[in-house]
């Protein structure tokens, strides 16, 4: 306000508030008061502040008071500075004169770029400062030049086989991580980052194996010192245990994820956290990660609206994949099985750190639900990477109809269960597809459609999902909002497509009850499939109604979106 007025106004309303301050300018004219500079525009004061900061021995914050729109006559210290799209000719001349810039009147309308002649005092000063700082910043390598050996998928062979006992996909990630950490070539370049207690994810074994990083070492005796996997901190520790500090953990991840470019030292950061507390809390940093061409893995553990049960609205994530898909170079997956996790992680390392060095980063959701883990079907590897593959075909006697069933993550097992019910009780056969990434499938499909539009005289490209699927009615079910699976609707060849999802707030209840509440369990998949077949005339509507009654589905309750 003061700088938008004049010296007399400043005398009355600033200095004149108290007799002591009024006396300070009693012998000054209004023009002299008006000429007083704010600290941020006073080179002597700035120099003094920086000089004092040099000797502080600790971080120093310099608060510099400045004027908005400085030396722009019509905008100086006015809120209209935010609305100014360009400076008038007179403002430019005034700006030039004040800062003593060597620009002729006739050149001002062209906004000439100001350079300093080589050898001039200004030129030598600027380059001298850069030399003193060991180079010019920002300086980024588009690709690192150091040697980096990408592990082959065969090195994770145990994860591709049927597991001896039920385990979760989060445990599959931990086993993959353990194998990486033991790799003699790149083990030291792995950066595990945890934003909460690592024991939540079964990672306590890393405490003894590689330790928790603490620059001061361990200065206390942890309460679990008598355990094998006690809370071991060390100066050479490798795990970054950030506590409940997602912003700090994401910042550590960003630093490691950009090390390939800034330091020519590729690091592979794995930031694992409750999936609800990732993009929802640090979404701006993840957008920055895309902007900065970061490389690494975000692991959304304990994911799924109905899978992290009993935690209610705060923890039950059914939309992180919606948030991740808005970042163009974030590659997202929601794997259902251990072998899918292994294929996706190895492929991610190869894409980001292999020969091509793609500028992408990965978001992978993993589960805390344990269940039987089959071996990888023959020929599934390519489909896992691309986002969809046929897991199985379930034949039925009677041939009363055929459907296609799609699913991902925790709900895929319910999709498989539905296929068996359809075959055994309704004579309906099905093709069952695992869709580790609806997002990648949709992106590839959109890319094909765009290419076809721009190349009308050439042979049209067929979206990958259209190559994999057929034209039978399709039903998709996931542990995420319907929008997640809806992404692929435009690209599937199916005659109809019905999507089930978990739109709405979470609940504190059992997984069984939550999946009933959100209408994504096997019974709802069956009813949705019968409904699609009935629309085609394959079944009478009464068959669908009888199935609803048989399964005890509640038809008059509020839509879970609003419940």
What function would you assign to each model-found segment?
Residues 1-374, ...:
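Thiamine diphosphate
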């Amino acid at each position: 306000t003061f700088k938008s007025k004049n010296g007399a106004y400043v005398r009355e309303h600033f200095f004149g508030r108290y007799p002591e301050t009024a006396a300070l300018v009693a012998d000054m004219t209004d023009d002299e008061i008006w000429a007083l500079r704010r600290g941020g525009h006073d080179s002597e004061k700035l120099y003094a502040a920086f000089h004092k900061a040099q000797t502080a021995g600790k971080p120093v914050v310099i608060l510099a008071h400045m004027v908005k729109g400085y030396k722009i006559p019509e905008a100086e210290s006015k809120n209209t500075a935010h609305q100014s799209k360009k400076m008038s000719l007179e403002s430019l001349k005034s700006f030039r004169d004040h800062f003593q810039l060597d620009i002729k009147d006739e050149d001002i309308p062209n906004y000439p770029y100001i350079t300093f002649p080589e050898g001039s005092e200004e030129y030598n000063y600027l380059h001298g400062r850069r030399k003193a700082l060991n180079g010019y910043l920002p300086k980024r390598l588009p690709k690192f030049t150091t040697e980096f050996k990408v592990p082959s998928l065969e090195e994770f062979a145990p994860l591709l086989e049927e597991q001896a006992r039920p385990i979760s996909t989060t445990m599959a990630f931990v086993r993959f991580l353990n194998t990486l950490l033991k790799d003699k070539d790149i083990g030291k370049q792995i950066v595990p980052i945890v934003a909460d207690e690592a024991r939540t994810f079964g990672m306590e074994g890393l405490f003894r194996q590689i330790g928790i990083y603490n620059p001061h070492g361990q200065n206390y005796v942890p309460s679990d010192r008598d355990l094998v996997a006690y809370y071991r901190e060390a100066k050479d520790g490798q795990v970054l245990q950030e506590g409940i500090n997602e912003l700090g953990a994401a910042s550590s991840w960003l630093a490691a994820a950009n090390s390939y470019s800034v330091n020519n030292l590729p690091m592979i950061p794995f930031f694992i956290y409750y999936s609800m507390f990732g993009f929802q809390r640090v979404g701006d940093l993840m957008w920055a990660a895309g902007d900065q061409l970061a490389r690494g893995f975000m692991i959304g553990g304990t994911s799924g609206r109905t899978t992290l049960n009993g935690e209610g609205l705060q923890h039950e994530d059914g939309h992180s994949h919606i948030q991740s898909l808005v970042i163009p170079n974030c590659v997202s997956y929601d794997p259902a099985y251990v072998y899918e996790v292994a294929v996706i992680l190895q492929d991610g390392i190869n894409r980001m750190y292999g020969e091509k060095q793609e500028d992408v980063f990965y978001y992978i959701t993993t589960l805390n639900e344990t269940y039987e883990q089959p071996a990888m079907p023959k020929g599934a590897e390519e489909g896992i990477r691309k986002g969809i593959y046929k897991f199985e075909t379930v034949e039925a006697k009677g041939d009363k109809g055929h459907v296609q069933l799609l699913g991902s993550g925790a709900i895929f097992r319910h999709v498989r269960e539905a296929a068996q019910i359809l075959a055994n009780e309704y004579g309906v056969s099905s093709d069952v597809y695992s869709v580790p990434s609806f997002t990648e499938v949709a992106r590839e499909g959109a890319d094909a459609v765009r290419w076809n539009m721009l190349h009308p005289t050439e042979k049209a490209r067929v979206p990958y999902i259209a190559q994999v699927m057929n034209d039978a009615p399709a039903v998709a079910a996931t542990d995420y909002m319907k929008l997640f699976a809806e992404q692929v609707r435009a690209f599937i060849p199916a005659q109809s497509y019905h999507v089930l999802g978990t739109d709405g707030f979470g609940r504190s209840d059992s997984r069984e009850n939550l999946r009933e509440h959100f209408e994504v369990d096997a019974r709802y998949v069956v009813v949705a499939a019968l409904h699609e077949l009935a629309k085609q005339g394959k079944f009478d509507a009464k068959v669908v109604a009888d199935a609803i009654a048989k399964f005890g589905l509640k038809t008059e309750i509020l839509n879970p979106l609003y419940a």
